[in-house]
């Protein structure tokens, strides 16, 4: 995906029972059709469990078969014709890419494995293709109210909330360390990480949000479609989706919520908008990421790393659907035949994919007003020669020839990061005589960010090579 702007292709599915009504909209045109599947049908109930099993026993053929059936059920008649026209606009570069916005008004339809969608004509696993983004939306104003403003001042704040896990299953400290590592590469003046850990209650969470005013709330813990497990008077208890929504309604700074909690992304049937993620969208949150299946701890940590690396340090900062696409692609490449890439679900409460924009001027003015003492320390000067040799070593020691087909994006990412690093070294070499220059400081921060990204891609390439 070369640019940061996607065209919307909207799919609305409504009705109380099959066949459901389908309306597709693109570029001022619309098409109507019908849709038969829902999660109550035996074959789709079984499909849900088949996808779950692939996370233990890899089965790419099963994933493609399920996604292909779902795609064929959706793309029929006039709806298919409109999709072919939209896809042609991408292939002929009239638009940069497409955002498939799924407005699924029946909980029984919403519970289908939409993230498995597979275009059999083009052999495309839709959720991970670089030209497409897959999101869930809601268009009924009675369900979802006004959107929040996207602009935030620097530093952007992330609150990581990780309640104590008495089972010991969740490695929250490792995930927090990964998040801090990514943010450290961006620099303290751009992003800050706050933590809330231990046996905290919903009241503690509300107070912490009110105090630090985060842009992103990242939750690490247990949950289900009806709520998240927090603590109350020394006991772990399920905090309802309604209680969480109430806190979010009083937290205007929060633009995005990441729920690394198994099953928090499943719709709570049969009533619409009863689940955790959906209630947070009703509270006005711009984007909510939640898990619709149980997810292994290592996969969840990798996904978070991929997502934040792209959302905050990628080519299109603040564009959540593009970051989601990149993160899913990372999981898809690292875990072949495993539906982990389809476990995270993105609900988007915006017309486009932008959940926040950074007010750089306001951030700089705020920093200046606080005085020199509050500024983060200037990073030490880089040894350009040493870094240049390190890049050469990375290129020499990384095999790329086997990265073809669906894995070609890894080769492209690796080479693009190498080019960016070499370009930054040339700029830093020219600025070396002015290490106190703010431009030099920014370039050093950029260099470190791309260096961390290159190391991450190299690790992913090594994982793919081992699994080949």
Give the role of each language-model region.
Residues 302-314, 326, 330, 420, ...:
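Solvent-exposed, amphipathic alpha-helical segments
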Residues 55-58, 167, 311-316:
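Short, polar/flexible loop-turn hinges at active-site or ligand-entry regions and domain interfaces
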Residues 1-124, 129, 152:
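Non-catalytic, solvent-exposed interaction/assembly segments
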Residues 128-142, 207, 211, 237-252, ...:
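Caspase-like cysteine protease fold
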Residues 109-117, 169-171, 267-268, 356-357:
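Short helix/loop capping segments that flank catalytic or ligand/cofactor-binding pockets
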Residues 105, 144-235, 259:
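A domain-level signal for caspase-like cysteine endopeptidase catalytic cores
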Residues 132-141, 216-306, 311:
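Catalytic cores of nucleophile-dependent amide-cleaving enzymes
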Residues 382-468:
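Long, low-complexity or tandemly repetitive, helically biased scaffold regions used
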């Amino acid at each position: 995906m070369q640019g940061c702007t996607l065209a919307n292709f909207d799919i609305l599915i409504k009705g109380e029972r099959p066949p459901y009504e389908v309306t597709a909209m693109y570029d001022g045109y619309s098409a109507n059709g019908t849709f038969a599947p829902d999660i109550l049908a035996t074959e789709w109930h079984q499909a849900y469990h088949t996808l779950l099993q692939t996370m233990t026993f890899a089965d790419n053929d099963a994933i493609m078969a399920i996604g292909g059936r779902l795609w064929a059920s959706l793309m029929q008649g006039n709806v298919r014709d409109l999709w072919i026209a939209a896809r042609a606009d991408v292939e002929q570069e009239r638009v940069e890419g497409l955002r498939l916005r799924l407005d699924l008004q029946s909980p029984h339809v919403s519970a289908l494995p939409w993230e498995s969608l597979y275009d059999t004509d083009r052999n495309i696993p839709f959720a991970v293709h670089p030209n497409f983004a897959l999101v869930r939306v809601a268009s009924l104003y009675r369900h979802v109210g006004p959107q929040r403003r996207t602009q935030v001042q620097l530093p952007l704040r992330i609150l990581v909330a990780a309640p104590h896990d008495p089972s010991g299953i969740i490695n929250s400290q490792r995930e927090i360390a990964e998040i801090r590592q990514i943010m450290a590469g961006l620099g303290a003046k751009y992003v800050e990480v706050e933590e809330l850990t231990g046996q905290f209650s919903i009241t503690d969470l509300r107070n912490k949000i009110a105090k630090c005013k985060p842009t992103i709330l990242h939750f690490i813990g247990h949950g289900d479609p009806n709520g998240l497990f927090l603590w109350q008077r020394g006991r772990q208890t399920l905090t309802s989706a309604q209680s969480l929504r109430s806190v979010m309604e009083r937290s205007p700074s929060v633009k995005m919520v990441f729920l690394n909690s198994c099953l928090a992304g499943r719709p709570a049937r049969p009533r619409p908008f009863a689940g955790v993620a959906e209630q947070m969208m009703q509270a006005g949150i711009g984007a909510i990421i939640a898990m619709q299946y149980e997810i292994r701890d290592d996969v969840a940590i990798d996904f978070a790393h991929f997502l934040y690396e792209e959302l905050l340090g990628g080519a299109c900062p603040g564009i959540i659907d593009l970051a989601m696409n990149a993160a899913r692609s990372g999981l898809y490449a690292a875990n072949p035949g495993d539906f982990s890439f389809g476990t995270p679900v993105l609900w988007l409460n915006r017309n486009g994919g932008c959940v926040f924009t950074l007010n750089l001027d306001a951030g700089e003015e705020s920093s200046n007003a606080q005085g020199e003492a509050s500024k983060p320390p200037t990073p030490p000067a880089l040894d350009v020669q040493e870094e240049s040799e390190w890049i050469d070593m990375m290129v020499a020691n990384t095999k790329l020839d086997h990265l073809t087909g669906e894995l070609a994006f890894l080769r492209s990412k690796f080479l693009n990061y190498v080019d960016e690093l070499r370009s930054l070294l040339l700029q830093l070499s020219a600025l070396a005589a002015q290490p106190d220059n703010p431009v030099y400081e920014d370039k050093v921060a950029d260099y470190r960010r791309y260096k961390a990204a290159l190391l991450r891609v190299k690790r992913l390439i090594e994982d793919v090579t081992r699994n080949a």
